[in-house]
């Protein structure tokens, strides 16, 4: 079943001069050339939706019915070529039936006999030995609170420097 399309494809050309051949909108003239699109065939076991945005394009989008898979492009657009007239960008897709096969696994109704015998007593079972890790000692170069002597010396120097700057530049505070 084919549907007659009542819309037109448009070729829009901007004329004008610009840097490196780019069109200049202020000096451009709009030339509108339209041709009727040919009828686009419908697809078997699928649907198509027609989209038209005023003057830029006409587009069909396709999807397949449940149980079918789309083979080909999911859309096609009508465009105008000066030498060829209007053409659709892609050929019609097709909807191919999905091959869903299920494999039944054989089931067994037989039962496995229970093994009788002796099993180890959980109370008397030996467990792997755990090795205790001795805590590591602080390196010798760290002091009581975990700081190196250089960190404490640097901190004292910074405090003395700040006190000297305050007293020198701002005068005695007392």
From Swiss-Prot:
Residues 35-97 form the Sushi domain. Disulfide bonds join 37-78, 64-95. Residues 108-133 are annotated as: Disordered. Keywords: Disulfide bond, Host membrane, Membrane, Signal, Sushi, Transmembrane, Transmembrane helix. Residues 108-127 have a biased composition (Low complexity). It is found in: Host membrane. The chain crosses the membrane at residues 145-165. It comes from the Viruses. Its main location: host cell. One of its GO terms (cellular component) is host cell membrane. Residues 1-20 form the signal peptide. InterPro entries: Sushi/SCR/CCP_sf (IPR035976), Sushi_SCR_CCP_dom (IPR000436). PROSITE patterns: SUSHI. It is a single-pass membrane protein. This is SUSHI domain-containing protein E3. It comes from Equine herpesvirus 2 (strain 86/87) (EHV-2).
């Amino acid at each position: 079943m084919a549907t007659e399309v009542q819309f037109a494809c448009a070729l829009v050309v901007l004329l004008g001069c610009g840097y490196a051949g780019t069109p200049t909108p202020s000096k451009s003239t709009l030339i509108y050339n339209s041709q009727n699109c040919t009828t686009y065939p419908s697809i078997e076991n699928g649907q198509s939706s027609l989209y038209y945005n005023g003057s830029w394009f006409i587009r069909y989008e396709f999807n397949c019915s449940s149980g079918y898979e789309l083979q080909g492009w999911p859309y096609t657009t009508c465009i105008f070529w000066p030498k060829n007239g209007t053409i659709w960008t892609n050929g019609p897709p097709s909807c191919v039936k999905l091959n869903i096969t299920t494999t039944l696994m054989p089931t067994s109704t037989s039962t496995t006999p229970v093994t009788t015998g002796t099993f180890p007593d959980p109370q008397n079972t030996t467990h792997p030995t755990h090795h205790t890790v001795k805590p590591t000692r602080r390196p010798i170069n760290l002091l009581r609170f975990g700081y190196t002597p250089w960190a404490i010396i640097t901190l004292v120097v910074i405090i003395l420097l700040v006190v000297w700057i305050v007293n020198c530049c701002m005068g005695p505070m007392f």
